[in-house]
Amino acid sequence: DIDGTLLDISHRLKHIKKTPKDWEAFRDPKLKQWDEPIMPIINIARAFLFNHPRDKVIFASGRSESERVDTVLSLSEWFLLDGWQKITSEGKLGDAVETYPTSPFYMRAENDFRKDTVVKQELYEQMLVDGYKPKLVFDDRPSVLKMWREIEGLKVVDVGMGVEF
């Protein structure tokens, strides 16, 4: 998970805690630039990435595919994601960096407004199709954590405050 797990998005939550939810404001790249890293979780993911080279750190986000560049830029200080090994500050793909470990990155399809539990279940199933076998999941939302816990053999780490949004 990205929002609330790797990045502190609390300053943007006010836009979706009201009725009607203002998803456009919540997803505004100008606001996302102020998302703060949650370094303890980032450090755990980086430790796995660098100390267990046979294993992959796989990223799955409920963010829409159209937010890929913003998301990759937000995480680029700590991670390189498959297909986006090097990105310029303008958000354009640069030359690939072959020596740096990269990570698969799954995102919600564009215009998919289903619940995160449904989307992340499908992302998990796609990971299996792609040959990955996730063993450990970090997430922050109670409903999504419940969904992850229902998958046999998967260890789940709750990094949230028990808050839905």
State where each predicted segment sits.
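Amphipathic coiled-coil/heptad-repeat helices and related helical stalk/stem segments
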Residues: 37-41, 117-120, 141
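Short, solvent-exposed polar/charged micro-motifs at secondary-structure junctions
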Residues: 69, 113-119, 145-147
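Acidic, Mg2+-coordinating phosphoryl-transfer loop and its flanking beta/alpha structural elements
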Residues: 124, 132-165
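Flexible, glycine-rich phosphate/dinucleotide-binding loops
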Residues: 13-15, 66, 114, 144, ...
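Short loop-to-alpha-helix "cap/lid" segments that border enzyme active sites
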Residues: 91, 115-127
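Glycine-rich phosphate-binding loop signature in dinucleotide/nucleotide-binding domains
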Residues: 52-53, 127-133
